[in-house]
Amino acid sequence: MSGSAAIMKAPAKSEFIIKPENTKAEVDTSNWPGLLKNYDKMLIRTSHFTPIPDHGSAPWSRDIKSYVSSGVINLDKPSNPSSHEVVAWIKRILRVDKTGHSGTLDPKVTGCLIVCIDRATRLVKAQQGAGKEYVCCIRFHDTVPGGEPAFAKALETLTGALFQRPPLISAVKRQLRIRTIHKSRLLEFDNERHLGVFWVSCEAGTYIRTLCVHLGLLLGVGAHMQELRRVRSGVMSEDDGSLVTLHDVLDAQWQYDNNGDEALLRKVIQPLETLLCTYKRLVVKDTAVNAVCYGAKLMIPGLLRYDQGIEQGEEVVLMTTKGEAIAIAIAQMGAVELATCDHGCVAKVKRCIMERDLYPRRWGMGPVASEKKKLKASGLLDKYGRPNEKTPASWLQSYKDYNVSSSEAPALPAPAGADAAAAPSTPALPAPEEKNESEEKSADASDSKKRKKDETAEEKAERKRLKKEKKEKKEKKKSDKDE
């Protein structure tokens, strides 16, 4: 072997040792559906909880009956029928109890109309106040001086907070109101045909018809709305692949009724959780879910995770670890307090969405609640859990009922070892005379009849005459109506 030949060295032993690491593989949740999207980016309050796998299910895994009754449809409303007619047709096709929509569209207007079914109708109010986007075709009454640049400038001018009065033919009172135009963009313009097409993103309740009239006034030629289409309502738009027609809904229900195929029905209907993706989230332990459904406040021990940037007084959505929406709530703490506090109220329920008893009851099973049950069973507390003369002093000192204010709290019973000699030697005052119950009732009755007793005979006769005339007039009116 020549000296220039490379000599392989034995590698150090340490290079083959796998060292222990205090890390774990990260899960990419950016593609998870609904409320579970970016779950790994939420801040962790605690990771310890008792899962209840036999109750509840992921929104996309519900049985078909629950799926339909907790669903929403992003419907492409056809021209001519009113929004109420369309919603009534959906109700009849799907054979459900309740339906509602996210905001009325005029009969001639087409586009996104979010139809909520049964449980999802609880979200209708929130969706009616969500932002909207429209594409509008405007017809000018004459050639626009300045052409396309003038039209684009007028659109830019009519951006921001605007005064609007509803059109002459409208379902609301014609009061002056302020509505905000967030953005607008010119799409097409034909000055020879006196037509223009523009896109607008605006606040709920904005009248595009009124906006077209204002554009005509600003350009000095007059204008009116020719056609209108809503392209986005809240979080749902015509580009996200969820837009369906009435024929699609009818076909999906027919397939399920005749062939038992629910695939098309699941494609047409979306879970209600899709409407809540813009809310900040609070993840609730499975054991606390049913208490929240019964109206309880969410407390710190029931919180698992929370989104960044939550502020006090903000609307948030309470969700389970499976991605189900429990309720819309008002946050009582900000994100900083949620990270540092060890007790307190996290959120108060504003609108409950989930049905009661979908998850089992888990309240009243802690050490304090168990002790309270024992005391009630042995007669040391009354049937409502309030202290009585037999209540031990240790319980009175340690237990605080947060549902009762300090002014309403019952007086604590005197300890058993209290000595009569400890009382001051002042002479006992005579007890005030107690009124009999029957005497109080008779006094109330006499007060109510005081007016009749004080009146003279002439006043009494006049009162009776007026009463008789009123009665005869009423009977005559009734008989005329029957004829």
Swiss-Prot record:
InterPro entries: Dyskerin-like, PsdUridine_synth_cat_dom_sf, PsdUridine_synth_N, PUA, PUA-like_sf, PUA_sf, tRNA_PsdUridine_synth_B_fam, TruB_C
Compositionally biased spans, kind Basic and acidic residues: 432-462
Subcellular location: Nucleus, Nucleolus
Region described as Disordered: spans on this chain: 406-483
Record EC number: 5.4.99.-
Top-level class of the enzyme under EC nomenclature: isomerase
DNA-binding in keyword set: yes
Domain PUA: 279-354
A Pfam family the protein falls into: TruB_N
Assigned GO CC terms: box H/ACA snoRNP complex; microtubule
Keywords noted in UniProt: Cell cycle, Cell division, DNA-binding, Isomerase, Microtubule, Mitosis, Nucleus, Repeat, Ribonucleoprotein, Ribosome biogenesis, RNA-binding, rRNA processing
Compositional bias annotation for Low complexity: 409-428
GO molecular function: DNA binding; RNA binding; snRNA pseudouridine synthase activity
Family in the record: Belongs to the pseudouridine synthase TruB family.
Subunit note: Component of the small nucleolar ribonucleoprotein particles containing H/ACA-type snoRNAs (H/ACA snoRNPs).
Function: Catalytic subunit of H/ACA small nucleolar ribonucleoprotein (H/ACA snoRNP) complex, which catalyzes pseudouridylation of rRNA. This involves the isomerization of uridine such that the ribose is subsequently attached to C5, instead of the normal N1. Pseudouridine ('psi') residues may serve to stabilize the conformation of rRNAs and play a central role in ribosomal RNA processing. The H/ACA snoRNP complex also mediates pseudouridylation of other types of RNAs. Catalyzes pseudouridylation at position 93 in U2 snRNA.
Name the UniProt record assigns to this protein: H/ACA ribonucleoprotein complex subunit CBF5
Organism of this sequence: Chaetomium thermophilum (strain DSM 1495 / CBS 144.50 / IMI 039719)
Organism taxonomic ancestry: Eukaryota, Fungi, Dikarya, Ascomycota, Pezizomycotina
